[in-house]
């Protein structure tokens, strides 16, 4: 720990939080600098919480209903407005055009469910955006599934598992869509 601090020149301490659920709000930023809501993303991490495991594939309405059941529709709408204003202001002098993902999570503190409204901000096409397009492309209406990545060439099997591209000998990851029954 000391060696790592010496190399980086800094130390960051954060409280341990009992994370219950991971979400992201996806936005787009256009040429004029306007930031607009794109979609919600519900994702899972490895038990350590440090690595991505996969995204829920569901309609935008199902994702909206899932998160509003936990935090309320008014809270979600206010959060989207706050993110939008903050992102437009902070990116005013930026030339960035594209997707913006704001990760958030629900955690339990003293028995109460709480929302961390901004864990990190990603200025790129996020896994949530890819999951959105995978849902549109591969999931039949009314169905749900999981979008996931696996290290290595992968071995998609079964009629409910769809590899998203052919993998070559040098592939390091494989993307899959797995449909729920």
What are these regions, as identified by a protein language model?
Residues 104, 121, 176-180:
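Short beta-strand element of the conserved SAM-dependent methyltransferase core
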Residues 140-181:
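Peripheral (often C-terminal) accessory segments that flank ATP-dependent C-N-forming ligase machineries
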Residues 27-85, 122-150:
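ATP-dependent carboxylate/phosphate-activation module, predominantly the ATP-grasp catalytic core
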